[in-house]
A protein has these predicted regions:
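Conserved P-loop
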Residues: 1-40
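Loop/turn-to-beta-strand initiation segments
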Residues: 46-49, 78-83
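Walker B catalytic acidic pair
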Residues: 54-55
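Conserved ATPase-coupling elements of RecA-like P-loop NTPase cores
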Residues: 59-66
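Catalytic-core regions built around general acid/base machinery
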Residues: 67-76, 92
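Short, polar loop motifs at secondary-structure junctions
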Residues: 86-90
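A short helix-turn-beta junction within AAA+ P-loop NTPase domains corresponding to the substrate/partner-engaging
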Residues: 96-108
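Conserved small/polar residues in nucleotide/adenosyl-binding loops
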Residues: 116-122
Length: 126
């Protein structure tokens, strides 16, 4: 991430893995707060690429409504791209997308090290 300098903004908006949650209501509030921040970036024409990592999981778990996601994405300026990641997108989300890619797991760092030692720079090898 050092390579990009001030051209990249990164926001970690959760507190760990959703399957280990201790407080579902707190997690839902974090997702909603994070979504409001994401929408501010989505609407800003200065940002050309917004990646919402694992947001599809948040939709599947009922933390945020998929219509809210679709409506928010539709607020983007013409040259802005929004990437949603996560497994199990609904047909409605898929139908609303310009591009859908299904990935096949070949190698993943979660298999090699404990979760507590992973950071984004470790995963990206930055």
């Amino acid at each position: 991430m050092k390579t990009f300098g001030d051209k990249l903004k990164f926001h970690a908006c959760g507190e760990g893995f959703t399957w280990e949650t201790q407080d579902r209501n707190k997690d839902i509030n974090l997702v909603k707060s994070s979504w409001r921040k994401a929408v501010s970036y989505i609407k800003d024409p200065n940002y050309k690429l917004i990646i919402l990592d694992e947001i599809i999981v948040a939709v599947k778990l009922g933390y945020i409504d998929e219509d809210e996601i679709i409506n928010g994405i539709n607020l983007r300026p013409e040259l802005t791209h929004v990437v949603l990641t996560g497994r199990g997108a609904s047909e409605k989300l898929i139908d609303s997308a310009d591009l859908v890619t299904e990935m096949k797991l070949i190698h993943h760092p979660f298999r090699a090290v404990s979760y507590t030692h992973l950071t984004l720079p470790t995963i990206l090898r930055v």
